[in-house]
Amino acid sequence: MLNSRVVDTPPRTSRRIKLSLMGPAFIAAIGYIDPGNFATNIQAGASFGYTLLWVVVWANFMAMLIQLLSAKLGIATGKNLAEHIRDRFPRPAVWAYWVQAEIIAMATDLAEFIGAAIGFKLLLGVTLLEGAVLTGIATFLILMLQKRGQKPLELVIGGLLLFVAAAYIVELVFSRPEIAALGRGMLIPDLPNRDAVFLAAGVLGATIMPHVIYLHSSLTQTAGENSKADRYASTKLDVAIAMTIAGFVNLAMMATAAAAFHFNGYGSIAEIEQAYLTLQPLLGNAAATIFGLSLVAAGLSSTVVGTLAGQVVMQGFVRFYIPIWVRRTVTMLPSFIVILMGMDATRILVMSQVLLSFGIALALVPLLAFTGNKELMGDMVNSKLIQILGKLIVLVVIGLNAYLLVSLI
């Protein structure tokens, strides 16, 4: 039946179906290039040059597989990950999962919101508090698009993702990294000291985002008129394109920081504002301005995605709904508190990414269990190879977290 349908579908129509179903992965991918990534990648590149590029490469491959599994769960079952946990786990475990998922979502939003505020401060010369107010207004305006349906939001967020990617192509041209050394950094694993382990955990936490694991399964769970086969075929292409773009941006961030800072004697740069001000004399005003614009674009789009993920988490785990503007208002409060207390914003960004890395396994374990369940997934159940790869990812994440805890004690 499926084969005959594929044969009978005209190629142009099939392409239109694939294109019309693409978009959810671009929303998820924004979570992989948020300001937390800027902070960790800049610090990693400035401190260790190209040494930690391999972490970005492997984390991005892991992220591709994870997001594909999340999307597949929504397509195959019509339910998202949080709903499946609610239906199958004991009530105390469900509440515990909900609490940790909300904490992860708030830590994520803290990084994204403050990052956008820093971007406005650098570009417009306003205070960080004024930048936060501008960020709040802008995110409310973007969230209003949701009233028009999911597709307009996908287009806007996808456009912002492409803008950030284009910005970093320009930054790479300005910084002129050494290609051979860059290639070695991407291919040869190395963790020279405890600081490198800390930053590697931060890069992992910034690259694999627990909140978008929950969100992606929600974005694909609505059936529509297309078959599961069509939707899954489109999703594979969607994930491949979106996550490749996100992976390139992360590599470009770290490579630019390495070329511009580490190899010019600025290895101690650890703050986004410091990076912006140092870029001006090193690479020119244009490079610094593009950096600031990309930070604002990444911050605004990712904080919107974080708000959507928070809604999915709350509704999925505890069936409780609050208006999205209420959630947006509440989740802005920690960012304003951090700013008003005068805390180190970039340090908060990096610490939030390390915290995120501890939430990855908690989302991955049930995701693997559900997508490996033949009764639940039917023909879309994971193959043995996918299950093995998924378990290896869980072990890597848990191992890195354990090593990090021991290193910090």
UniProtKB/Swiss-Prot annotation:
Protein's membrane topology: Multi-pass membrane protein
Transmembrane segments: 19-39, 46-66, 98-118, 122-142, 155-175, 196-216, 241-261, 290-310, 320-340, 348-368, 388-408
Residue runs in coiled coils: none
Keywords on record: Cell inner membrane, Cell membrane, Ion transport, Membrane, Symport, Transmembrane, Transmembrane helix, Transport
GO molecular-function term, one example from the UniProt record: metal ion binding
Alphabetized InterPro entries for the sequence: NRAMP_fam
Pfam families referenced in this protein's UniProt entry, alphabetically: Nramp
Cleavable signal peptide: none
GO BP of this protein: iron ion transmembrane transport
Compartments, as annotated in UniProt: Cell inner membrane
Cellular-component GO terms for this entry: plasma membrane
Function according to Swiss-Prot or TrEMBL: H(+)-stimulated, divalent metal cation uptake system.
Family: Belongs to the NRAMP family.
Protein name: Divalent metal cation transporter MntH
